[in-house]
Amino acid sequence: MTVNRLADYLEHMRQAASDACGFVEGLSKAEFLADKRTQQAVVMSLIIIGEASTKIMDHYPTFIEKHANVPWRNMRGMRNRIAHGYFEINFEVVWETVYSALPELLQQLSIVFSDVDQEPY
């Protein structure tokens, strides 16, 4: 019997996105770019988001199709770029992701969460 972990993966994504936004709260871009500890915390959050996205893509293709507006592949791609090209991380892109993409992702996740129990995935 396979356990449905979809809600768990989505919650990991929500928590990591919320954490990343919290880590940079009150920081300017210059402060973020000079703060290695915050950079590392945000990067780890992005890896968690990408890993959960990958799990959802691999195990719940119907859910992915139904929620095609969520940037599942982009999240996986960012995770792969960070994990496999660690010495080449562009922290300006990371900053833009946290300030632009993650608030939007949090809104999208609140919508897709309501669909988790609607159908068996």
Region locations from a protein language model:
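Solvent-exposed interaction patches of small proteins and small membrane subunits
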Residues: 1-121
